[in-house]
Amino acid sequence: MSNLKEIKRKIKSVYNTQKTTNAMKLVSTAKLKKAEEAAKRSKIYAQKIDEILSEISVQINKIVHNEDDVRLFLFHKKEQIKTVDLIFITADKGLCGGFNIKTLKTVSEMLKEYEAKNINIRLRAIGKTGIEYFNFQKIELLEKYFHLSSSPDYEKACEVIHAAVDDFLNGNTDEVILVHNGYKNMITQELKINHLIPVEPKSIEQTHNSLLELEPEGTELLEDLIKTYFEYNMYYALIDSLAAEHSARMQAMDNATNNAKARVKQLNLAYNKARQESITTELIEIISGVESMK
């Protein structure tokens, strides 16, 4: 009888877990739809900025005539790389499957790779999971940003990237790389590594005899465009990461709900079997008692 009570207690516990994970799945699904729409809209704008800046980068020396202009430094890769700044995004919350693992594994591998080349790598962490992971590993973080990955904010994104750009222009770092797990579709996330600084022309069709004309005067537009390019790439990465996070959490909670359902089914079978055995045992005892009285 005690065995039946124990099984019944387990069924109730797993069933409650099933209801919780199913509710979390529904919440993530609703949040995903909103985040997915925001990511798709932002992606179009980010791609267009990339295309324009890539086109300009081909003829940058024609636009900026002063070789000492700081804007040129943002396009020219240094011959010797001594320091690299790595900005990476993870989730502030858990229960999202392997979403954070891809990013953390990639960052850890990059750390080893650069250290093997005697290149100093500085980490700028966005998201509680990544911050706690590297704190546990006793790896120093240059910057820590909490609550930004779960609530993307344009002004805060600007703050993050402006600090990195300033360090590049001041000679404190030679390259800035952005790593995040991005949204591909409702069931797939895609790890993205973006070499933000210096600006690298994207793989689009371009020629040195470009017909692109800049209005207003080239250098004025270039300054605003570069600023927008850095800011929006940072902001888009946050939005893209959040959509991927909701997608991963929706899948994780769906899997957890299905596993809980399967476990409840197993426990119900075990309960029915134990109950049947208990009834059979009682019947045998009754029959045996009657036989002994004859």
Swiss-Prot record:
GO terms for biological process: proton motive force-driven plasma membrane ATP synthesis. It is found in: Cell inner membrane. It is a peripheral membrane protein. GO terms for cellular component: plasma membrane; proton-transporting ATP synthase complex. Transmembrane segments: none annotated. The keyword Glycoprotein does not apply. Keywords: ATP synthesis, Cell inner membrane, Cell membrane, CF(1), Hydrogen ion transport, Ion transport, Membrane, Transport. Pfam families: ATP-synt. GO terms for molecular function: ATP binding; proton-transporting ATP synthase activity, rotational mechanism. F-type ATPases have 2 components, CF(1) - the catalytic core - and CF(0) - the membrane proton channel. CF(1) has five subunits: alpha(3), beta(3), gamma(1), delta(1), epsilon(1). CF(0) has three main subunits: a, b and c. Produces ATP from ADP in the presence of a proton gradient across the membrane. The gamma chain is believed to be important in regulating ATPase activity and the flow of protons through the CF(0) complex. Belongs to the ATPase gamma chain family. This is ATP synthase gamma chain. The gene is atpG.
